[in-house]
Amino acid sequence: DSLCGRRVLTSEFVRGRKLTMVLDEHHQRGDQEAVSGILHALLDAWFRQVLVGGVFQADPHPGNLMVDDDGRVVVLDFGCTMTLPEAYRRGYFRVLQAAIVGERTVIAETLAELGFATRSGRPDTLLAFTDALLDQIRVAMVETGAAGTQWPGPEALMEQVRALLIRMEDDPVEKIPAEFVMLARVFGTLGGLFLHYQPRLDIGRLVLRYLTMPETLGDTPRQAATPEPLPWWQRWGLVPRAEL
């Protein structure tokens, strides 16, 4: 980390194999536990980047993801990285909280504060968009438990898309923050992996951990303890090899 700074990003060579190659091998052997473990680590990593660090790698296509010889997920190429202003980090976290408990008024108000707007000014399209993105998490929190999340199949997914397109034709979204465009890109890419491999994950337990973290709730000032910016690997929740 001593080689990295505000203007310098230092790379290292890491041995590993392409993530999808490893997942395919586990899937063909019927090792669903291994598939689920890898994808759990992947989702956990991006939740931590976005909700805790406020900095995330914004290009997680399969070519930028590997699994090393120890089974750890490796993220390559931090050239496309997005930093969320603190108000946006807190705002998206508040939307997640409100979506889980069904507080639609809070969702609408928070999205307006973040800069989202429809042509009419009504929140209906924004709420439908939020439902499409977060309903899977909400259902996992209240229904599935440790048995694992049931991911939608192609038909259910297309029905969601059709309903959203109809809503957007009626009252399109005309203002979307740039940060959200990158977030949607990230979780849309990751979502493709989950829909394809159908891992059995306890999403509720994972999300609950972030809902109760002091770092995400803002109870612990993240900047006050260190006048200088934290090393990038700490902000993204990564562990240096020396500490393993």
Q: Model segments located where?
A:
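Conserved ATP-binding subdomain of kinase catalytic cores across diverse folds
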Residues: 1-20, 53, 57
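Helix-rich C-lobe and terminal helical cap/extension of kinase-like folds
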Residues: 2-5, 14-16, 24-41, 68-244
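Conserved kinase catalytic-core helix
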Residues: 30-58
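C-terminal structured domain segments across diverse proteins
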Residues: 49, 57-62, 147-151
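Hydrophobic residue at the +6 position relative to the catalytic HRD Asp in the kinase catalytic loop
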Residues: 63-67
